Amino acid sequence: MSDEKNLGVSQKLVSPSRSTSSCSSKQGSRQDSWEVVEGLRGEMTYTQEPPVQKGFLLKKRKWPLKGWHKRFFCLEKGILKYAKSQADIEREKLHGCIDVGLSVMSVKKSSKCIDLDTEEHIYHLKVKSEELFDEWVSKLRHHRMYRQNEIAMFPRDVNHFFSGSSVTDSAPGVFESVSSRKRSSLSKQNSFPPGSNLSFSCGGDTRVPFWLQSSEDMEKCSKDMAHCHAYLLEMSQLLESMDVLHRTYSAPAINAIQVPKPFSGPVRLHSSNPNLSTLDFGEEKSYSDGSEASSEFSKMQEDLCHVAHKVYFALRSAFNSISVEREKLKQLMELDTSPSPSAQVVGLKHALSSALAQNTDLKERLRRIHAESLLLDPPAVPKPGDNLAEENSRDEGRALVHQLSNESRLSITDSLSEFFDAQEVLLSPSSSENEISDDDSYVSDISDNLSLDNLSNDLDNERQTLGPVLESSGEARSKRRTSLPAPGPNTSSVSLWSILRNNIGKDLSKVAMPVELNEPLNTLQRLCEELEYSELLDKASRIPSPLERMVYVAAFAISAYASSYFRAGSKPFNPVLGETYECIRQDKGFQFFAEQVSHHPPISACHAESGNFVFWQDVRWKNKFWGKSMEIVPIGTTHVTLPAFGDHFEWNKVTSCIHNILSGQRWIEHYGEIDIKNLNDDSCHCKVNFIKAKYWSTNAHEIEGTVFDRSGKAVHRLFGKWHESIYCGGASSSTCVWRANPMPKGYEQYYGFTQFALELNEMDPLSRSLLPPTDTRFRPDQRLLEEGNIEEAEVQKQRIEKLQRERRRVLEENGVEHQPRFFRKSSDDAWVSNGTYLELRKDLGFSKLDHPVLW
């Protein structure tokens, strides 16, 4: 015990880059920051089993709950279990279980907080007294090193979470927790496919056979699970023998049971010896106290039976799941490579004929509507009483009428990617590409070529008649690019841990990162990406019912997150103070511009105008690194006005989290609640909940929303996945309000960019003369990264950052405060456009201004 006290917290919790001989001022500042607790390194070993630590701690409630609650914790052999009380721990009625050896542990001495970051959750713990804090940190450190040494010595035990020589060492709750984590990790590899070799699609994609043929990890997993299955069958026989022995000891003649001569200690059953040959009933020695030994031995048998049965059934279930999944994938590969049977060809021909006839009918309807719209003033406003389904099926002939099968709500949310039989609204030409199932992929290709090209042209023509008239000078483009000049760099050689280990719990927006970790877009351009589906606002501006308008505004707010699904592997450039960006899109009918209005704190403001809507927001992000994951917390409000009805909508943003920062396949999720209000009309409001993924569930990226009327009654319900599609209605009758555009070819090589994102940094000679020199497209480090010149991009990035620091120092020395050029601060501290950007652009006014040197 004295040895443990000598391992002082201040000596052992120092970050690897810090010296233990720091002066007192540095020690004081260290107490105010998060520090990582080091584990075993190199050839270090730790074989001494630490004592069990128990007691009450404060644990932060899991999202969405807030505050702290009191829980009883038990730390034994590197496993931290917790429940409401000690009695619940003893009864194995656990609330959770953490493998400390596999977690990243960080502490903050000033607030007496301990954070344990696993792959699935971040556990925030707090200790009331400093003495208890030091004691728990010391014990956690010892148990963590002991557990890491055990993992290093017996790596197989990490997968199965119990030792072959002592099954009773694993509590049932412990195994269930880890077993579910392992099953979850397998499901997540299918649920979060960005950039992963495990991603696949059913439609002749060659990635499917490649994944099956090169899946060494799955082969190893199958072999390991088969070994476990055989071993657990042997354990089952052992349990039956023990059960017989238990009934024997429970008989009245318990004192007559004999044991072998050399036996002098308590009975110990070895799980690797199922025949119980160490017991000999032929000797004449008996227990000195038979009833007491019988009671203790019976209790041990009951505990062992309870744990072993849970282990057996859990692993058998996992084994069956993996076997079934692999068989499905093998069948998929066989179907993918084998010729289609004649019956299938006949069915596909019928489907093709039906699709062509339907598309021809739709094309004729759209032509008539387009011809009528040219003869009329602004489109006639439908009657207010029409509901959303009637509007979608009637408005401009855009509905593809397919009846949704009468399935349960659960079956819909299980796989929305296969939910193509719903009644759907064509919001963009690319939306229809997903209307036919993957098995009919070649039918989709043919029908697209024959009719959907004409259909999309009609839709574009109709949009232009309704959209604003934009200046044509410098905006004519032949064709937008479909790829970047060079693919993204290989970042496997970048050591994120060496960069982030000293920044646990800190705001990462102030931490310099290597240019390889960036994508060739910056935050201002990311704000413009939120307008990729601006047609939802165009649609809302033509709907008379405020309740139905709210549905499309909510869908627009959700669609802003769709492009992030494939973008977890890189981060955007941070804009420098005074940097600007513009995006004029005639095809979408809006004009967008943005400016970095503040550097400390970093605030980006943007504004967009259209004949149908006005969009603006100012936002800043706080990034928190927690060891294995990073949270991105946005601060700011998004505004949209619809002049046709005098609506002014505003809403907040939700929290984003990138998982597996240091190792494994990174994936992103969004969670929290968006509250959408109409400031000029209180007849309705909307709440959209981004559901946090649970490691025991395969459902991820789901949203649920409700539109309420003035009395609080739910009028419309929204559901779907934020990266796929949004539906309005119930399980038996729903309307597809929005569907994400398909990804461009080769998107994995180009940072996971959508087609819209690929075009954001594009610059042609005509638009070059219209842009101010502060526009992001002139930024050299970002342009060099896009072109694949990593070394020169890093040099330019450091030069630009140094130049910004010098500008800030000069401003501070002269007492000058930076004044944004195109935005002003309103009375509620929000940044809004001052109306000068678009006016200056008309008359080439940017060339007449003095601009700061940003790069």
Swiss-Prot record:
Residue positions of motif FFAT 2: 450-454
Modified residues (Phosphoserine): 15, 33, 199, 250, 272, 277, 288, 291, 340, 393, 405, 408
The record's account of how the chain is modified after translation: Phosphorylation is enhanced in vitro by phorbol-12-myristate-13-acetate (PMA), forskolin and calcium ionophore A23187. Phosphorylation seems to be stimulated in conditions of low cell-cell (or cell-matrix) adhesion.
A cellular component term, taken from the record's GO annotations: endoplasmic reticulum membrane
Annotated InterPro entries: OSBP_sf, Oxysterol-bd, Oxysterol-bd_CS, PH-like_dom_sf, PH_8, PH_domain
Topological type in the membrane: Peripheral membrane protein
Motif (FFAT 1): 161-167
Gene Ontology molecular function, alphabetical: lipid binding; lipid transporter activity
Disordered: annotated segments: 1-32, 274-293, 377-396, 468-490
All copies of domain PH, residue ranges: 50-145
Low complexity: bias regions: 15-31
Keywords: Cell membrane, Cell projection, Cytoplasm, Endoplasmic reticulum, Lipid transport, Lipid-binding, Membrane, Nucleus, Phosphoprotein, Transport
Keyword Glycoprotein: no
Subcellular location: Endoplasmic reticulum membrane; Cytoplasm, Cytosol; Cell membrane; Cell projection, Filopodium tip
Expression sites (tissue/organ): Expressed in spinal ganglia. Expressed in a subset of small lymphocytes (at protein level).
Purpose: Phosphoinositide-binding protein which associates with both cell and endoplasmic reticulum (ER) membranes. Can bind to the ER membrane protein VAPA and recruit VAPA to plasma membrane sites, thus linking these intracellular compartments. The ORP3-VAPA complex stimulates RRAS signaling which in turn attenuates integrin beta-1 (ITGB1) activation at the cell surface. With VAPA, may regulate ER morphology. Has a role in regulation of the actin cytoskeleton, cell polarity and cell adhesion. Binds to phosphoinositides with preference for PI(3,4)P2 and PI(3,4,5)P3.
Domain notes: The FFAT 2 motif is required for interaction with VAPA and regulation of the endoplasmic reticulum targeting of ORP3. The FFAT 1 motif may contribute to VAPA binding. The PH domain binds phosphoinositides, with a preference for PI(3,4)P2 and PI(3,4,5)P3. The PH domain mediates targeting to the plasma membrane.
Quaternary structure note: Homodimer. Interacts with RRAS. Interacts (phosphorylated form) with VAPA. Interacts with OSBPL6.
Family stated for the protein in its record: Belongs to the OSBP family.
Protein name per the record: Oxysterol-binding protein-related protein 3
Native source organism of the sequence: Mus musculus
